[in-house]
UniProtKB/Swiss-Prot annotation:
Catalyzes the conversion of glucosamine-6-phosphate to glucosamine-1-phosphate. Binds 1 Mg(2+) ion per subunit. The gene is glmM. One of its GO terms (biological process) is carbohydrate metabolic process. This is Phosphoglucosamine mutase. One of its GO terms (cellular component) is cytosol. Its EC number is 5.4.2.10. GO terms for molecular function: magnesium ion binding; phosphoglucosamine mutase activity; phosphomannomutase activity.
Length: 444
């Protein structure tokens, strides 16, 4: 694969107003994508966004670029990332474009693409788009220019899709649910899904103003959700991130239920119903407690590199259907083609309803191991992880933790940092082992 100049692992992302998140680059990107995507099909591209104020600027620029290349744009407004994947498929569009920086602050934004089947664009297509970005723009004949339209019922379509994944003979009547939408793209979707399934819903983080996305709310900051759940006597709390592809949950006692626990609950329920389709894909950061709990059920488990993109790659490689990250990216491939926070939360709620069990009871089946994370800054160009002394200490720690824990040492890709992670069923042992490795890293 050729080295990328503009596209990262999750499209193009950065600070608004600084290259590449500028209106002129978005215009050129729309044009380049349009030139590559133009086929004999409908020549239509869906464009969705989260609630950042910069989304207006970027969608207009993208639309102009697409039109110059002869493709029409269909705007769906603020919609979750997984909704764009779904709608791109159902509208038979050439592609879908999402304008979002996910869980980042409002002053960041990004642009990523879905293929016509709602999956990440193939590498060769991204490379072809990149190659065109360095060429001068041209414009199709006036009669061939693209148009723009707005799809007014996109939210309703996606709400119905989400509800359709919930068991037809079940409902959420009698449940009190607090829904935190991070002032992001799920603000007009998730509360309505839960209400229409019968739940009593308390909303927080559903008043976006363009600047407050992910601000002290949502999947990356659940303190407000925990407080409201406990004070209101709710059964469960749901926290989505800015673009709706992550989910964190809170039980009735205010305890956090993370992606690893959510993944286990969904896997166990799929096993019981005969719909597991193989095993489960986690990541290098998935808690060992998840691995142990799945092993007790004889469910195969494998680890991908950190990032939902790599989880998806492993799922496809193995032909499995379920994977995710402890950060709350949960992929259920027989429901949607990408991580979907609303779908994942409905899977857990369906398990709660089927067994008349609280989230606390369901999550208790995954006793998470204490995890110690320490970042160690290093000087100079040499990677301390290549030191024989560090390797020897790491090997000794691994031997002591055998069967009871594990270590993960990673060099940051963006900073001169070594990330030391140790987890063990004995928290004190995890802490002492981590400190031992840190000292070795600092000394080399």
């Amino acid at each position: 694969m050729a080295e990328r100049k503009y596209f990262g692992t999750d499209g193009v992302r950065g600070k608004v107003g600084q290259f590449p998140i500028t209106p002129d680059f978005a215009l050129k990107l729309g044009w380049a994508a349009g030139k590559i995507l133009a086929t004999q099909g409908t020549k239509q591209v869906l464009i969705g966004k989260d609630t950042r104020i910069s989304g207006y600027m970027l969608e207009s620029a993208l639309e102009a670029g697409l039109a110059a290349a002869g493709l029409s744009a269909a705007f769906v407004g603020p919609m979750p990332t997984p909704a764009i994947a779904y709608l791109t498929r159902t509208f038979r569009a050439e592609a879908g474009i999402v304008i979002s920086a996910s869980h980042n602050p409002y002053y960041d934004n990004g642009i990523k693409f879905f293929s016509s089947v709602g999956e990440k664009l193939p590498d060769e297509v991204e490379e072809a788009i990149e190659a065109l970005l360095d060429q001068p723009m041209d414009c199709v004949e006036s009669a061939q220019l693209g148009k723009a339209m707005r799809i007014n019922d996109a939210a309703g379509r996606y709400i119905e899709f989400c509800k359709g994944t919930f068991p037809a003979n079940a409902s959420l009547k009698g449940y009190k649910i607090v829904v935190d939408c991070a002032n992001g793209a799920t603000y007009h979707i998730a509360p309505n899904v839960m209400r229409e399934l019968g739940a009593e819903v308390i909303e927080i983080g559903t008043k976006p103003d363009g600047l407050n996305i992910n601000e002290k709310c949502g999947a990356t900051d659940i303190k407000a959700l925990q407080k409201v759940v406990v004070e209101s006597g709710a059964d469960v709390g749901l926290a989505y991130d800015g673009d709706g592809d992550r989910i964190m949950m809170v039980d009735h006692l205010g305890n956090k239920v993370d992606g690893d626990q959510i993944l286990f609950i969904i896997a166990r329920e799929a096993l019981r119903s005969g719909k597991l389709h193989g095993g489960v894909v986690g990541t290098l950061m998935s808690n060992m407690g998840l691995e142990v709990a799945l092993k007790h059920l004889a469910i195969p488990f494998t680890r991908a590199n950190v990032g939902d993109r790599y989880v998806l790659e492993q799922l496809k490689e193995k032909g499995w259907k379920l994977g995710g990250e402890n950060s709350g990216h949960i992929i259920v491939l027989d429901k949607n083609t990408t991580g979907d926070g609303i779908i994942a939360s409905l899977e857990v709620l369906a398990a709660m309803e089927a067994h008349k069990m609280s989230l606390n009871d369901l999550a208790r089946a995954v006793p998470l191991f204490p995890q110690v994370l320490i970042n160690v800054r290093f000087e100079g160009g040499k990677n301390p992880l290549e030191s024989d002394a560090v390797k020897a200490v790491a090997a000794d720690v691994e031997k002591r933790l055998a069967g009871r824990g594990r270590i993960l040492l990673r060099k940051s890709g963006t900073e001169p940092l070594i990330r030391v992670m140790v987890e063990c069923e004995d928290g004190a042992l995890a802490q002492s082992c981590a400190e031992e490795i840190v000292e070795a890293v600092k000394s080399n």
